[in-house]
Amino acid sequence: AFGLLMAAVAVWTFMDWVEAGCSHKEQGFLWVRNRFFTKKAWICRNVDTAILLGLFLGLTAFWNGAALIGGLLILAGLAVFSDGKLDYVICAGLAVLFSELQSKIFVSGSVMSPSFYWGFLADNKSISGVLWYLVEISGFFFVGMIVAAVFLKRGQRAVLMGCLLPMAFAFLVSLTPDINVNHKYVMISYAFVTVFWGWIVRCVFLAGKNSWKKWAGRAAAAVLC
């Protein structure tokens, strides 16, 4: 819980970086290009904050390595759409450094053995089979959020995509011989994406101006819960 809390603090803090990157007026490819090939996209915005967050995230590896990896994956997703990418690099670099130091001190032998592993626990490893497995374990939660992303604002989509990265990681990579461990990354994505789901349910609940639309919205919100 402490590791996940620190990851949440880091994600919440870097929201200002995401807002700065998504507030530019450019549209489409020009905006995407400027997120990588301009000075603002890379120059540090707050080095002290990046160092502090990197220190705290690195120390969480002692309690929960999955929370550290999940948090760094989300931050990597946010960094793509943010200004001040060097702050993300500093934060992630320090977090990995402190994590490695702890593993050298407290653990003998290799801690992780990364390998490509497609499909997580899905019996059918085809794309359709994996998507169906995702529906089976989460209902229409994750699939619904991907559809809802079409209607979100630029900054909201950026954060949502970042929050979904741990889940994508769980279906693509295995860090230990036991793939069941990857359920932690699915749960981390679930925890963060739930914030968006709660906001959508709230909007549906409050939708409608006349009586029948209000009650229809409340009924739909109850189903979505």
Task: Please report, for each region that a protein language model flagged, where it lies by residue.
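Membrane-interface alpha helices of multi-pass inner-membrane proteins
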Residues: 49-64, 76
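Membrane-helix boundary/interfacial segments in multi-pass membrane proteins
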Residues: 1, 102-137, 164, 168-193
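Hydrophobic/aromatic-rich transmembrane helices and adjacent perimembrane loops
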Residues: 69-72, 179-206
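Membrane-lumen/periplasm interface segments of specific transmembrane helices
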Residues: 81, 89-119, 140-154
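Hydrophobic, aromatic-rich transmembrane alpha-helices
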Residues: 9-20, 73-80, 136-157, 200-203
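Signature aromatic-anchored transmembrane alpha helix within multi-pass, membrane-resident enzymes
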Residues: 47, 90-100, 203-225
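Specific aromatic-rich, kink-prone transmembrane helix
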Residues: 1-37, 56, 193-196
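Perimembrane helix-loop-helix junctions
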Residues: 18-22, 28-47, 69-96
